[in-house]
Amino acid sequence: MINIVLFGKPGAGKGTQAEFLKEKYNLTHLSTGDIFRFNLKNDTELGKQARVFMDNGELVPCEVTTAMLIDEVKKHPDSAGFLFDGYPRTLDQAEALDKFLPTIGSSVTATIALEADDEILVKRLLERGKTSGRADDQDEEKIRVRYQEYNEKTAPLIGYYKDQNKFYAVDGIGTIEQITERLTSVIDNL
């Protein structure tokens, strides 16, 4: 089983690349955003718990997010592996994932970060915001706040996975095909 954690700042191309990687490697794509939307829309018990925090403008606790992710993993017992997109975002979540995966006889194979200069990513998101309808892609100040949050909470994961020799940085600038080629080169050599 191959399990890839794909991360990078908003606009780095994670969603676009995840589509290619899940097909090429027959992975189950687990997007935290999609999982949250499913649980909220279907008013699941975990969705109800998350909504209480969200309605108060608070971050959903690690335990709730992790429980949603575990539920989703358990729905795919025959998967060839997972592509985690948007999870883990914090050290607590990374540790929770490392505790859970061995219970299904697995572990994180690699963590791949799509890296790109903030100014290029801001331009990408503002451009995407013209057609995506996402309010958080249309406001440069909000985009920069998201980057600050990434730097504070998610960037420390680099050291965590480097210590396990599971971290790979990939240049996220170029055509979609060029970036896909860089990613597959890393995965093919694991």
From Swiss-Prot:
InterPro entries: Adenylat/UMP-CMP_kin (IPR000850), Adenylat_kinase_CS (IPR033690), P-loop_NTPase (IPR027417). Keywords: ATP-binding, Cytoplasm, Kinase, Nucleotide biosynthesis, Nucleotide-binding, Transferase. One of its GO terms (molecular function) is adenylate kinase activity. AMP binds at residues 32, 37, 58-60, 86-89, 93, 134, 146. It is an enzyme of class 2 (transferase). Residues 127-137 are annotated as: LID. GO terms for cellular component: cytoplasm. The keyword Cytoplasm applies. Residues 31-60 are annotated as: NMP. It holds the Pfam family ADK. ATP binds at residues 11-16, 128, 174. Its main location: cytoplasm. GO terms for biological process: AMP salvage. It catalyses: AMP + ATP = 2 ADP. Pathway: Purine metabolism; AMP biosynthesis via salvage pathway; AMP from ADP: step 1/1. Its EC number is 2.7.4.3. Catalyzes the reversible transfer of the terminal phosphate group between ATP and AMP. Plays an important role in cellular energy homeostasis and in adenine nucleotide metabolism. Belongs to the adenylate kinase family. Consists of three domains, a large central CORE domain and two small peripheral domains, NMPbind and LID, which undergo movements during catalysis. The LID domain closes over the site of phosphoryl transfer upon ATP binding. Assembling and dissambling the active center during each catalytic cycle provides an effective means to prevent ATP hydrolysis. PANTHER family: NUCLEOTIDE KINASE (PTHR23359). Monomer. This is Adenylate kinase.
